[in-house]
Amino acid sequence: LLFQFGAIADIHNQAKEKYSPGWKNYFEMAKWLDRNVNGEAVVACGKPSLFHLYANKYTLRYKFANPEEVLKHLEERQVDYVVIDQVYGNTLRYLLPAVQQYPERFQQVQHLTNPDTYLLKFKR
């Protein structure tokens, strides 16, 4: 039982720490989306439940697959926006290659630096 109190204290102390720059931009992008995109929107991103907390939009995870399958999944799920972040390795592994292979299907809406974080409109 005494060991549990130490773990709780550690969690409490971690909660007080600042976010890393990547996470800070991830949440700032979600806040920007909430302020600037009216109505309903579907957003594909790496950590959808966390992004939703600040974006107040419907979020989902993109498919972990080749670029063709990622694009098909975005179309099937009627995605409006995607987030290219620097916090989730699968974004660079799966979502970014789809954006690079089909640049005509994506339009930059917002960009944050240090590290680069992008909100892209998906053209269905």
Give residue ranges: language-model regions.
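Transmembrane alpha-helical segments
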Residues: 1-23, 31
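Residues at the C-termini of beta-strands that transition into short coil/loop
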Residues: 2, 47, 63-65, 112, ...
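Alpha-helical elements of the RecA-like P-loop NTPase motor core of helicases
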Residues: 3-6, 52-53, 93
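Flexible, glycine- and charge-enriched loops at secondary-structure boundaries
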Residues: 19, 23, 60, 67
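Short periplasmic/luminal acceptor-recognition loop of GT-C membrane glycosyltransferases, typified by
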Residues: 34-63, 81-86
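Periplasmic/luminal catalytic loop of GT-C fold multi-pass membrane glycosyltransferases
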Residues: 67-123
